[in-house]
């Protein structure tokens, strides 16, 4: 039973009812985990940069990826830590490579997502595809058309996003667990990546498809809830908690329990977020 989260340095004990968890203590836990993840990310990228090919295009692209990866609340990474603490009763502290890799996966997904959504900013920064297009226009002047500049920006951003996906696996490899556990982490991580992409496919194609709530409500509702489950529930809650539990040595029963708790919770979160987006004012 979960009663409260009691933190001492990086150890968290869970022993009370969820409704009784001290909110401030949990927020402090998230903030402390974010600091740990941010520091580890800088270290990992510094190490990785030593092996990067000597090419200015690649190194500039890596810097763009690092810049886009900085900041953020690191909630998913913190949930990986929480999953590990639950599974190991606060005894294991191997979560950081998985958390850093997962946060890089999120950054890479968002780089691609910004192209799909035609977003111009992300975390207060100009998105990579927009920034790349602007810079090539500035450097080439009248020598490049708007269309070609936009195509270049999108192409470069796609490459950088792909680069981030593959680097994230190298970060996971730093996890100091035995090979059997690491293999399970890789397997689950790959599953989460695939399911997130499946959700993105449905989310991208559905608005342009002839299926609508008016024509076939049941089919439309099913697809909307698939998006909720794949893009939010798995990617934001279930996946991180399950990865942490696997890292902490949790058995299949615990991992499955976390999944069964997190998926409906994540779905409910996305429904509420959508409702706020539709009905709330800017002041809310």
Residue ranges, per PLM feature:
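Conserved N-terminal diphosphate/IPP-binding helix and adjacent helical/loop segment
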Residues: 1-102, 107, 111-150, 200-222, ...
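All-alpha helical catalytic cores of prenyl diphosphate-utilizing isoprenoid enzymes
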Residues: 44-55, 67-76, 155-167, 171-282
């Amino acid at each position: 039973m979960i009663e409260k989260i009691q933190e001492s340095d990086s150890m968290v004990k869970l022993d009370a009812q969820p409704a009784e968890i001290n909110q401030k203590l949990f927020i402090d836990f998230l903030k402390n985990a974010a600091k740990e993840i941010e520091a580890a990310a800088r270290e990992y990228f510094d190490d990785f940069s030593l092996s990067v090919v000597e090419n200015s295009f690649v190194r500039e692209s890596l810097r763009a990826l690092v810049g886009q990866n900085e900041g953020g609340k690191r909630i998913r990474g913190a949930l990986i830590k929480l999953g590990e603490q639950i599974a190991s009763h606060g005894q294991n502290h191997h979560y950081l490579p998985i958390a850093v890799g997962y946060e890089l996966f999120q950054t890479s997904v968002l780089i691609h997502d910004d192209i799909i959504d035609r977003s111009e900013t992300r975390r207060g920064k100009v998105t990579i595809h927009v920034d790349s297009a602007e810079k090539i226009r500035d450097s080439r002047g009248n020598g490049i058309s708007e269309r070609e500049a936009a195509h270049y920006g999108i192409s470069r951003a796609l490459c950088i996003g792909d680069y981030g996906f593959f680097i994230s696996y190298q970060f996971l490899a730093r996890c100091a667990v035995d090979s059997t556990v690491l293999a399970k982490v890789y397997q689950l991580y790959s599953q989460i990546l695939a399911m997130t992409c499946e959700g993105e496919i449905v989310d991208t194609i559905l608005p342009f498809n002839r299926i609508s709530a008016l024509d076939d409500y049941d089919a439309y509702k099913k697809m909307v809830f698939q998006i909720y489950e794949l893009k939010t529930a798995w990617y934001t809650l279930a996946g991180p908690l399950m990865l942490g539990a696997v890292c902490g040595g949790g058995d299949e029963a615990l991992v499955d329990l976390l999944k069964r708790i997190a998926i409906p919770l994540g779905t409910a979160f996305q429904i509420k977020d959508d409702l706020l987006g539709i009905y709330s004012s800017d002041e809310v």
